[in-house]
Amino acid sequence: MFAHLLLTAILGLTALPPPETIAIRAGALIDPASGTVTKSQVILVSNGKITAVGPSVTPPAGARQVDLSSAWVLPGLIDAHTHITMDMSNLDDIMLGSAYLRESSARRALRGLWNAEAILNVGFTTVRDVGNDANYAAVDIRRALANGWFIGPTVLTTGKIITPFGGQSQRVSPEQGPLWLFEYIDADTVDEIRKAVRQNIYYGAQAIKMVADNSAFYYTRDEIAAAVAEAHAAGLPVSVHVGGGEAARNVILGGADSIEHGFQLSDELLQLMKEKGTALVSTDFPEDHLKLMNMNEETDGMTLGRRIVDRLRRAHAIGVKLVFGTDCVLERPDRRKADLMLDYYDVWKSAGIPSAAALKALTVNAAELLRIQKVRGTIAPGMAADIVAVPSNPLDDLAVLKKVIFVMKAGRVVKQSQ
């Protein structure tokens, strides 16, 4: 009985308040799909959804008024590549064999919930967790947040990462056995790949994540196609971690929905991505983050950080569909993961990506890739009321997204600093 009362008290302290009818008076409303701005709009929200948008919308009696008349309002932001349960600030954990040996699933699930509220407060109302999630812990984090037990974004999950033998464990001695199976599924034939997709779906995955080239082995076109066929039959997109080269070609021609990272993609492969409609979730690490992880190595006269910027610039110029994703796995004593995620906007600026294109990558494009475009990614009647606001025009300077002053999640105001 005491435990039940204690749990009730804890949930009462952290749970979202019930939804209410709210009228938001937006000084400027941004439509990322078109890059246009309309002034003096009223957004009416009821039961967690947007019910009306326009300059002359009349709020019903008793509706709560939210004055954002001096702000710029836009759809909630989406990070399509996160690891909310991970902290790889300890360089030993970069080898992805020690994090899940040192920490229990329970500890990492608690970290994920701790991160979730902070991530929402900086403007990300939806994130996709792409594995390394402590044995499906992110699935239960998603359910806890969806049930309103805790405050956080909508979390979409991929479950365990499907890989050729060995996962991303680098080098584990044969005496230790396949330690990586806590977070990866070894799948080395078409049948094993299909079964791995089915396993993830069974345990609650809403998307599929594969690693194509993290070892001496990489997936063939037919193997990628098998995963895509199985996932698409269940309505799930497939995203694949790959650098470039022949492995990337197999990913594109195998029909994957997106490439994650792609730091070594050539112009030829980027052009092929455009032709096939393969999105790039670019995970554009800032150079100081790479240095903290000892990953900013130089090859062919170019550091990885510079290579990332160059690849992003070329992808945009060629017309590849860009989707924003951070892959932020760090925590620092003075800065939390959510705050570090904001540094990625600077990379897009340094690559010369127009703010309108970046906003589209953060909303519309991400929603389409995640197959949630019918409920998220735009501000329109019938859409989920995931809304953020900033103090000035992000189309002029993307960096203002670091200064989110208002967050609404599913019709509930969770942050208002204006």
Regions found by a protein language model. Name each.
Residues E368, P381-Q418:
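C-terminal cap of metal-dependent C-N hydrolases
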Residues M88-L91, A138, Y218, A248-G254, ...:
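Histidine/acidic-residue-rich catalytic or RNA/ligand-binding cores of hydrolases
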Residues W72-R143, N147-W149, D222, N250-G254:
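Metal-associated gating/positioning segment near the N- to mid-region
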Residues T85-R108, F165-F182, K274-G305, G319-L322, ...:
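Active-site gating loops and adjacent loop-to-helix segments of metal-dependent hydrolytic enzymes
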Residues D140, E192-L280, M302-L322, K374:
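Histidine/acidic residue-rich metal-binding segments in metalloenzymes
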Residues A71, H81-D87, V211, H241, ...:
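Histidine-centered divalent metal-coordination motifs
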Residues S98, A233, R306-N393:
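His/Asp/Glu-enriched, well-ordered alpha-helical/loop segment
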